[in-house]
From Swiss-Prot:
Component of the ribosomal small subunit (SSU) processome. It is found in: Nucleus, Nucleolus. One of its GO terms (molecular function) is snoRNA binding. InterPro entries: ARM-like (IPR011989), ARM-type_fold (IPR016024), BP28_C_dom (IPR012954), HEAT_type_2 (IPR021133), HEAT_Utp10/HEAT1 (IPR056473), U3snoRNP10_N (IPR022125), UTP10 (IPR040191). HEAT repeats lie at residues 245-283, 389-427, 428-464, 584-621, 659-695, 1058-1095, 1189-1228, 1265-1302, 1309-1347, 1398-1437, 1678-1715, 1769-1806. The gene is UTP10. GO terms for cellular component: 90S preribosome; small-subunit processome; t-UTP complex. Signal peptide: none annotated. Residues 690-705 have a biased composition (Basic and acidic residues). Gene3D superfamilies: Leucine-rich Repeat Variant. GO terms for biological process: maturation of SSU-rRNA from tricistronic rRNA transcript (SSU-rRNA, 5.8S rRNA, LSU-rRNA); positive regulation of transcription by RNA polymerase I. Belongs to the HEATR1/UTP10 family. This is U3 small nucleolar RNA-associated protein 10.
């Protein structure tokens, strides 16, 4: 409550307008852009308005839009407006007007009139405080100018977070650099938003200007780029979210700005922002489209060029290059847009935009399209804006669009007609026709149909055969191709036949020569015909000799151009067609046809499909032939004359027919479309229908046939034999791809069928592989994978074959084969049977741990880590750990002697090697177990605990932490236990669980990971097998308190939560089952947690203890936790905050139960033999704390809980809405607590600290009651005899009222009725302290509720005013009573008057006694002045006459008393209130009456009296001053006579001169302020009287008195002329005569008259200097004063007097010369001055004195410098004097004259040498 009140008061103070704080008001008034603070502070609003209105008028002449402000903020009425007195709605309207003006004036702030006008807003309307944001943003574009420094100086200190960046620059008064503003816009969201909103608001009002928009665009663009750069992140989702946040901030700004088309410069700035967004924000296409539409929707004829530039950048970032329709239409509507594109293309990348426009223009439907689009596209292309490649891209778009229109039949009219005309036009262009042909090739359109539609020829004739691939094009370049073919063919015509088949293994030079020739000749039929007739190919015997066909088979299966390979297949087809009548068996070609059907080229596949059809027709003719007589092509020689060809598998013709016709032919067209389809088909055919999955079966339905297993087996072997024998690795790869998918058919698997391929491949060298890759252009890695896929996973022999191939001769294996082999093992692993897996795993483990072959061991380890090991395998591995270290149990740690002895180095080393080996093995095995879903294998528990035992032994032996091994082992156990918890029915053998080992890990390990895992394991075991761990669980909590609880990471938090959730409940239940006290039994646990509190991260504390108490049971344990907290941490704020939060979560009943048990524990603490307190708090133990201190800490903590928890609220809810039983229980519990507290308080009455703590607890306990119940309780307690207790409860009520916000009528009435009880105490109690408490409480009641019933407060005020309070001799009760009356004055207002007859005299007497006393009683002094101030505020008319005189007299005495600084402030504040509030006549008369009393008390009293008069003049109307001017003049005369009276030789105890000077300065100030409020009619007679009083008021014999009075008078006149200036120059006529007289008799070297001499000269200087009415030009006035004044030069007779004359007299003479301003007058003055420049003139001593001549020269010099050529018009008269003075005997005179001459020459621009000769 207290903090809430403090916050409210702070908020009120922060927003206070300081209406009573004069200093603050003056400071606020002195804030100005054009005046210094001192000057600004002295100006009134009339003066300010006059200056500022001039600037406003000039602005109106510049811009008529300013004229509207004449009616409001620049009207005469505005001078009296005060924002502090306006309502909220009025201020809001004013804000709107001010912002409109600032928006308009922002463009002209560098002009003086604008600054003047803005200064009026600052001075009158305080825009720098009320409209700080708008004003700052108005000035911000000028942040590099001196104007901004002036602006910074007036900014308030409490800038919001939005503009906090400017605070350092305000304090250091330096200009903020641009980068700082950019950085703030980048990082400060509110500043960025404020800047954007300001610019938009100004632009909407049409007040924007170039400087503002440029500044905004530059800052915002850089800031946006910085924000987007900062949004980048390593995580894509975070970066996306960050960039979305930036877009959310900038897109609304762009949306609003684009709508302001009348602000084209602003729109261009938005284009810049769009460019930044496009380049940095990775926008999606739809966002870019919206931006592009916004850009085109915002541009005008003045800025569309910038818009097109922006569009070009946006279009580059799009993935889909077409543009929105609105964008295209907007571009087409622009004038001369083609020329703009031409101009921009040289500077910006507009290609993307142009291509997008072209694409979008041709995408419209032909019948609906805009007819202007196609001509626009034609112009874009024909203007050569695009490069050749870009033009080809554009033409390709046109061709594709035209092709689409062709298909739709829309080429006859509309867009189709326009496009056809445009294409014809391009075809006729010399520059575009070649590009159009290339575009035709790129577009892939049907050239023939296009030519027919356009009725023209689009490209020249090409070769007779269509050419598709780029490789072949390189060979067929017209005549070059003809020559190359001839050259290649010539040697082949005579070549000898050395080959039997080109499919034989090994390289063939002849084949390479033939292939080269065929490539060159494949382009024309003639060359092909010549080629196939080559004798070397044996074309005449294609059936008998495989050479002819084998060439073309190898060619179309090789890496050759597509067209050539297609021709090769067609030649084979032609050959077979020619042999159709010979019934030949051509099944030898079938594998190669299948390979061709899997070729990537569609043309090859299509030609191969045609070939397969021929084979099918041929097979249908031969299917019924006798196989024994059939002629099979290539049989025995297909792969050469060798064993390879003999072992090739062939099938009967009828089976071939079935395979081709029924299996392959139905899906023939699918093979052409999909190169993988033939493989899928054959896989399905061979595997049969039962082995197919649903998707395969669906695909195979098209074959419509199911072959029997023997046929499928034969087909499989047929294809496998060709895959094994063929030397073409491309064919081998394509066959293996589907053969490996077959896997097994019957008892035959692919490993058996393809073993030869595997064996051959394994032996190939790297060089051979490279030759394969280079020669056939295939991936050997892919081929290697297919070869290794031959290994059938379900055949252990096959797996063994692979394993032995990898390990038997591992060093000679290729690295790629090793890697691929282990990858294959990984693939087959899931298919292994358990026994096979176990065998293979053991062998791999052995290899992994071997040190012989690092690569092999690494591969084996990688395999074991990557596969999912089964339960038997990992159990076998785990058992190997214990089997490998059987004797470790007998080993202990080596003794220190053995460890340090040099003689034992060898044995130790050997032991280290053995240990290292064991550790490596253990580590690897545990890692494997950990990664193999060990949670599914509870059978591992026994072995894991054995391993844990081994690790502990190794720790002792090696003195190592073994953290990693322990973490692995415990982690595996934890995963098993966690799985066990989730399956309660699962049975696990718990006999092998060793809780002691886990606890040992917790206690001895230093690794947080090990500790946390062990704790989680204990928590898990406590849930599923509590009997195993509870007996040893306490050390865990001790450890947690010192370790885990202190960690600040999420994992540790999880550990703690699970430990609490799973260990604590069974532990408590176990204690209950044993019928032990649960609190005592868990004290160690509680101690661990409470001790660790300070180390627990703050954000986790509350959640942790909530969980702990919930699991323990709050009814039993909450009080214990609170007590242990309070005992250990006392009043630590963090602990108290946690306790408060914990208590607040409980209901009222639980809180009351907790506090009752808590108080019982406090009572037990103070017992001689404590019980529970000894266990929980250590009371009575040897190292325990003092029980009394413990009790104090506990009680203080309880007080805090009662004060800050929600008990009161929850009790109120219980009483209001609870059941009767709940209410009764709550009442009973509260009564018990109250009884306990009272009893405890009684029992510790003699122990002051504990008793004090009890009283505090009692008070806070009572604070939980409602105010009505609280007052009732207080009344009961006040009936007790103990005054100490009564004081406390009254103080409690006061505190309660101080923090209470009870405003209900019942509470108010009850508290006000309590005043009678307090009055009774005042009247009857002899205890002063009790009375003091009662008065304080009365004051608080009056302050809170007094206005509800003033009569009751008045009754109390009367008692306080009387003898029972103010009449008491005790100082404290008097002070309290006076302060209470001051407070009541505010409450009662005029109602306080009945108390004044008794109160005010007593107060004045008390003040008089205090001032008369020898000791300093500042408190009573201040209290009296507090009452006086309150009365002056609320009933000022009661302070008059005698009361006023007493107050003034005592105040004068107080000023002469040595009091504290605060006391002086209180007195001065009261005097200021007196001046402001008391009737002005009474105030002036009172000061005048008591003037002598003030003088008697010293200068300070006089100064304060004058301050009262000055304030009264200031704060009251002019009429009040006019009416009381006579009294004021009397007072001023007294003040002006102080010098005469106080500095008189007859007055020994008077003021010193400094004090008199200060008093006169204040009196002058009072006089001037009085004069300001008088008019000339009133003041002139007064001035005449004052002059007469000063000049002739004293007798001529009183020389000293006259000098003193004249001195004061002329000092006043100096201020008078200096302040009022030209207004009062005419008053000089009244004092000329007196001034001349003074000049005649006063001397600067005479102490008695020196001050008067100085005053007269300074007065004259001010009068001369401010003459604007030509007063001193009058010969009469000038003549009377000039000569006496100039004669003062003669007083310069020595160095000191020369300095005085130079400092005072000469400047005055110069000012007179300036005021005289006439050649005649100047001549007259100069004549007199020159008299003092020549010896023999002047007074008795004349100018014979060099100092006099020097003074005259200095005077002439200053006149020359000041008046320049005007004065030098008298140069002819001065030249003789100058000549004489240049020869003067005195060096100083001569030197000064030379300076004067130089000054003259400077002005005239010529030398005086000729004139002086």
């Amino acid at each position: 409550m207290a903090s809430s009140l403090a916050a409210q008061l702070a908020q009120i103070a922060a927003t206070s307008t300081h209406q009573l704080d004069l200093k603050a008001q003056r400071a606020a008034h002195s804030q100005s852009l054009i005046f210094e603070k001192k000057i600004a502070g002295s100006q009134d609003f009339d003066t300010i308005f006059q200056v500022c209105h001039e600037g406003f008028q000039e602005l109106c002449s510049l811009d008529s839009r300013f004229l509207s402000f004449r009616r409001n903020i620049f009207s005469d009425q505005s001078k009296t407006e005060d924002r502090g007195q306006m309502t909220t709605s009025q201020n809001k309207e004013l804000d709107s007007v001010l912002e409109d003006f600032l928006s308009l004036v922002g463009a002209r702030l560098l002009l003086t009139p604008a600054v003047k006008a803005v200064d009026w807003l600052i001075r009158r309307f305080r825009v720098h405080e009320y409209n700080t944001s708008f004003l700052l943003l108005t000035f911000l574009p000028y942040h590099t100018t001196p104007l901004f420094l002036n602006f910074l100086s007036i900014l308030p200190e409490d800038l919001t977070q939005t503009f906090k960046v400017f605070l350092p620059y305000k304090r250091s008064m330096t200009l903020p650099p641009r980068q700082v503003i950019v950085q703030s816009a980048s990082t400060n969201k509110s500043f960025f938003s404020a800047l954007n909103n300001y610019v938009l608001q100004v632009s909407k009002s049409q007040a924007h200007y170039q400087g503002l928009v440029s500044f905004w665009a530059g800052i915002t663009t850089e800031a946006l780029a910085n924000m987007l750069d900062s949004a980048k992140s390593g995580r894509m989702e975070i970066e996306t979210r960050n960039k979305e946040d930036v877009l959310i901030r900038i897109l609304p700004v762009l949306n609003d700005a684009f709508m302001l088309r009348k602000a084209p410069q602003l729109v261009v700035g938005c284009y810049m922002l769009c460019v930044v967004l496009a380049n940095k924000a990775s926008l999606e296409d739809h966002v870019l489209d919206n931006l592009m539409e916004a850009v085109t929707g915002s541009w005008t004829q003045t800025n569309f060029v910038s818009g097109i530039t922006c569009l070009s950048v946006l279009s580059q970032q799009k993935h889909e290059k077409s543009l929105p329709s609105k964008v295209v239409k907007a571009v087409l509507r622009l004038d001369n847009v083609i020329e703009v594109f031409e101009e921009l293309s040289g500077r910006y990348a507009v290609t993307g935009l142009i291509i997008g426009l072209i694409r979008s223009c041709v995408q419209e439907n032909g019948k609906r399209s805009d007819p202007a689009r196609i001509p626009f596209v034609g112009q874009l292309i024909q203007r050569a804006i695009l490069s050749d490649s870009e033009t080809i891209e554009a033409l390709t778009i046109l061709l594709q669009a035209f092709s689409d229109l062709q298909r739709q039949g829309l080429v006859a009219d509309g867009m189709g007609k326009q496009l056809s005309d445009l294409l014809l036009q391009f075809n006729e262009s010399d520059t575009l026709a070649p590009l159009l042909r290339k575009a035709i090739e790129n577009a892939g359109v049907d050239i023939t149909q296009l030519e027919m539609t356009l009725e023209t020829v689009l490209q020249a004739d090409i070769m007779p055969m269509e050419i598709e691939d780029a490789d072949l094009l390189d060979f067929i370049s017209s005549s070059q191709t003809q020559d190359a073919f001839a050259v290649a063919l010539e040697p082949l015509s005579q070549a000898a036949i050395t080959e039997s088949s080109f499919l034989a293994p090994g390289s063939s030079l002849l084949f390479d020569q033939l292939a080269e020739a065929f490539i060159h000749g494949a382009s024309t039929k003639d060359r092909v015909s010549r080629f196939i007739k080559l004798p070397v190919l044996r074309p005449d015997k294609p059936l008998d000799d495989p050479l002819y066909l084998s060439f073309f088979i190898r060619f179309f299966s090789g890496p050759y151009p597509v067209t050539a390979r297609t021709v090769a297949i067609s030649i084979v087809s032609s050959c077979i067609t020619a042999m159709a009548d010979k019934s030949a068996d051509m099944q030898g070609i079938l594998p190669y046809i299948i390979s061709a059907l899997a070729d990537p080229s569609e043309r090859v596949r299509r030609e191969a499909a045609a070939l397969l059809s021929l084979i099918d027709r041929l097979a249908s003719k031969c299917k019924d032939n006798d196989d024994s007589n059939a002629q099979i092509w290539g049989r025995g020689c297909l792969y050469g004359q060798n064993e390879r060809s003999e072992s090739v598998q062939f099938l009967p013709m009828k089976d071939i027919y079935k395979i081709i016709h029924h299996a392959l032919m139905p899906a023939l067209e699918e093979y052409v479309l999909d190169p993988d389809q033939v493989g899928r088909t054959l896989t399905q055919v061979i595997r049969g229908p039962r082995s197919q999955d649903d998707s395969d079966r669906t695909r195979s339905e098209s074959t419509g046939v199911e072959f029997k297993k023997p046929l499928r087996r034969d087909l499989f072997l047929f294809l496998c034999s060709h895959a094994s024998k063929t030397a073409l690795y491309t064919v081998k790869l394509r066959l293996l791809k589907f053969l490996n998918k077959v896997g097994k058919i019957g008892s035959l698997n692919c490993t058996e069928a393809l073993r030869q391929v595997f064996d051959q491949w394994r032996l190939l060298s790297l060089e051979h592989l490279q030759r394969i890759e280079d020669g056939e252009r295939i991936s050997t890695n892919e081929l290697e994978d297919q070869v290794l896929s031959i290994i059938y996973p379900k055949d252990m022999d096959a797996v063994d074959l692979l394993f032995s191939s990898l390990t038997s001769n591992s060093r000679s294996n290729r690295e790629s084969f090793l890697t691929a082999g282990f990858n294959r093992l990984k693939e087959v692993w899931p298919s292994l049977e358990e026994t096979h897996e176990l065998s293979l795993a053991n062998r791999l483990l052995q290899i992994s741990l071997s040190l012989e072959n690092g690569k092999l061991a690494g591969a084996a380890k990688g395999l074991l880590r990557s596969v999912d090991l089964s339960g038997p395998v990992i159990l076998e591995f785990l058992n190997k750990i214990s089997a490998s270290v059987p004797d470790l149990g007998s080993r202990g740690p080596p003794s220190k002697k053995r460890r340090t002895s040099q003689n034992n180095m060898v044995p130790m080393s050997s032991m280290d090697k053995e240990t290292d080996s064991v550790l490596q093995k253990m580590t690897f095995i545990l890692e494997l177990i950990d990664s193999s879903h060990s949670e599914n294998h509870p059978e591992l528990i026994s072995g894991l605990f054995q391993t844990l035992t081994i690790i502990h032994h190794l720790k002792l032996q090696t003195r190592s932490e073994m953290s990693y091994l322990l973490s692995l082992n415990l982690g595996i156990l934890l995963s098993i236990v966690n799985k066990w918890k989730g399956m309660p029915t699962r049975k696990i053998n718990t006999s092998s669980i060793r809780a002691d080992l886990i606890i040992d890990c917790v206690r001895t390990s230093e690794s947080p990971q090990v500790q946390n895992t062990a704790l989680l394991l204990v928590a898990g075991l406590a849930t599923v097998a509590p009997e195993l761990v509870l007996h040893s669980v306490m050390p865990i909590f001790t450890f947690m308190g010192s370790s885990v609880l202190r960690k600040d990471d999420e994992y540790s938090a999880l550990v703690i939560d699970q430990t609490i959730d799973q260990v604590v409940p069974p532990l408590v239940q176990s204690l209950r089952n044993q019928k032990r006290d649960v609190v005592s039994g868990t004290s160690e646990l509680l101690l661990s947690f409470t001790t660790a509190f300070e180390h627990i991260p703050s954000y986790r504390r509350l959640r942790l203890f909530e969980a702990l108490i919930t699991k323990l049971g709050p009814e039993d344990f909450l009080f214990a936790v609170f007590a242990m907290f309070a005992n250990r941490y006392s009043m630590d704020k963090d602990v108290l905050a946690t306790m408060t939060a914990l208590a607040s979560d409980c209901n009222a009943e639980l809180q009351l139960i907790t506090y009752a048990r808590y108080l019982n524990l406090v009572k037990d603490t103070l017992q001689p033999k404590p019980t529970l307190a000894k266990t929980l708090l250590g009371v009575g133990s040897e190292d325990g704390r003092d029980p009394q201190k413990i009790a104090v800490d506990l009680l203080q903590a309880l007080s805090h809980l009662l004060k800050f928890t929600s008990l009161r609220t929850k009790m109120s809810e219980c009483f209001d809405s609870g059941t009767e039983q709940q209410v009764d229980k709550a009442h009973g519990l509260f009564s018990t607590i109250l009884e306990q507290t009272l009893a405890l308080s009684e029992s510790v009455r003699t122990v002051k600290p504990v008793n004090s703590a009890c009283g505090e607890t009692l008070g806070t306990l009572l604070g939980t009651l409602s105010l009505v119940d609280f007052v009732d309780t207080i009344e009961v307690l006040l009936q007790r005899p103990s005054d100490d207790l009564r004081r406390k409860v009254i103080k409690l009520l006061e505190n309660r009222l101080d923090s209470s916000n009870d405003r209900d009528k019942a509470s108010q009435a009850r508290v006000l009725s309590f005043l009678t009880v307090l009055i009774n105490i005042l009247e009857t109690s002899p205890d002063i302290l009790l009375k003091h408490a009662a008065v304080a409480c009365i004051e608080k009641i009056g302050e809170k509720y007094g206005k509800k019933d003033p009569s009751q407060v008045l009754a109390a005020a009367k008692v306080i005013s009387g003898e029972h309070c103010l009449g008491q001799p005790d100082r404290r009760i008097r002070v309290m009573g006076l302060l209470c009356l001051a407070s009541m004055s505010e409450i009662l207002g005029e109602g306080i008057i009945p108390t004044l007859p008794e109160a005010l005299p007593r107060a004045i007497d008390l003040l008089r006694d205090t001032l008369a006393a020898s000791d300093d009683d500042s408190q009573l002094h201040d209290a009296v002045y507090s009452l006086i101030s309150a009365l002056l505020i609320h009933v000022p008319w009661m302070i008059s006459g005698e009361y006023l005189d007493n107050i003034l007299q005592l105040s004068f005495i107080s000023s002469n008393t040595d009091l504290a600084e605060g006391s002086d402030e209180n007195r001065l504040e009261a005097l200021q209130l007196l001046a402001k509030r008391v009737d002005v006549k009474e105030a002036f008369a009172g000061v005048e009456r008591n003037w002598d009393s003030a003088v008697t008390q010293g200068s300070r009293a006089v100064q304060e009296a004058l301050d009262v008069v000055r304030t009264a003049i200031e704060k009251h109307a002019k009429s009040a001053t006019v009416k009381n001017v006579s009294v004021l003049m009397k007072l001023l005369c007294k003040a002006f006579d102080l010098r005469r009276l106080q500095l008189s030789p007859l007055n020994d105890g008077g003021f010193d001169e400094a004090e008199v000077d200060e008093i006169e300065s204040r009196a002058n100030d009072v006089a001037v302020r009085m004069i300001y409020k008088l008019n000339d009619t009133v003041f002139r007679p007064l001035f005449i009287d004052l002059t007469a009083w000063a000049v002739s008021g004293l007798g001529k014999k009183d020389t000293t008195g006259r000098v003193a009075r004249l001195t004061t008078f002329y000092r006043f006149l100096e201020s008078f002329f200096g302040t009022l200036k030209s207004i009062v120059t005419g008053y000089s006529s009244y004092i000329i005569e007196s001034a001349v007289e003074v000049l005649k008799f006063s001397r600067c070297n005479d102490k008695a008259t020196k001050t008067l001499w100085l005053a007269v000269l300074r007065m004259l200087r001010n009068s001369f200097g401010h003459d604007q009415d030509e007063f001193w030009q009058s010969p009469t006035h000038l003549a009377s004063i000039s000569e006496p004044l100039i004669k003062q030069l003669s007083m310069a007779t020595n160095s000191p007097t020369l300095d005085l004359v130079a400092a005072e007299a000469i400047p005055t003479i110069v000012e007179l010369a300036v005021a005289a301003d006439s050649p005649d007058n100047h001549k007259e003055l100069n004549t007199v001055i020159m008299k003092f420049m020549r010896a023999g003139h002047g007074n008795a001593r004349g100018a014979d004195n060099p100092y006099t001549r020097l003074a005259a020269v200095k005077c002439e010099q200053q006149l020359t410098e000041r008046l320049g050529e005007e004065w030098l018009a008298l140069l002819p008269e001065m030249l003789p004097y100058i000549s004489e003075l240049l020869e003067d005997d005195d060096e100083n005179v001569e030197r000064e004259v030379r300076r004067w001459v130089l000054s003259i020459e400077d002005i005239l621009g010529e030398k005086l040498d000729d004139m002086l000769t």
